[in-house]
Amino acid sequence: MSSKEIVSNRKALRNYEVLDTLEAGVVLTGTEIKSLRDHGGNLGDAYVAISKGEAWLLNASIAPYRFGNIYNHEERRKRKLLLHRYEIRKLEGRVAQKGITIIPLGMFLSRGYVKIRLGCCRGKKAHDKRQTIIAREKQREVESAMKRYR
């Protein structure tokens, strides 16, 4: 079971603290699949909303397929996520908590199907972002020191 990341949301990892992750299928059209295989997607402003017991991916941009003619898809349409009922209830419970939102972290191919990795996230404040940068720099210094004394 190989999986190949085709779109990632690097902005989410910088602006949000990921508390929990989940995989879901996505209902897509043929031209959307072909465009994603050419890495024509963007999850920068995307989020997941739950309404009437269904999960929807909103504001995800999939570029029009360059060889698609009049049958090409809309770039920013609502896309249904394929989840079990208990997974949707779990997400609804997490979103009900204050400050928690569901953000797509990446899209990947799994056995020919496009899957999306969702994260239950809490927004980072400016000081949290600085702490993350400081911790990353300290880790880099430690690794370089270890490399030097091998």
Curated annotation (Swiss-Prot):
The gene is smpB. Required for rescue of stalled ribosomes mediated by trans-translation. Binds to transfer-messenger RNA (tmRNA), required for stable association of tmRNA with ribosomes. tmRNA and SmpB together mimic tRNA shape, replacing the anticodon stem-loop with SmpB. tmRNA is encoded by the ssrA gene; the 2 termini fold to resemble tRNA(Ala) and it encodes a 'tag peptide', a short internal open reading frame. During trans-translation Ala-aminoacylated tmRNA acts like a tRNA, entering the A-site of stalled ribosomes, displacing the stalled mRNA. This is SsrA-binding protein. PANTHER family: SSRA-BINDING PROTEIN (PTHR30308:SF2), TMRNA-BINDING COMPONENT OF TRANS-TRANSLATION TAGGING COMPLEX (PTHR30308). Transmembrane segments: none annotated. GO terms for molecular function: RNA binding. GO terms for cellular component: cytosol. It comes from the Bacteria. Pfam families: SmpB. Belongs to the SmpB family. GO terms for biological process: trans-translation. Keywords: Cytoplasm, RNA-binding. It is found in: Cytoplasm.
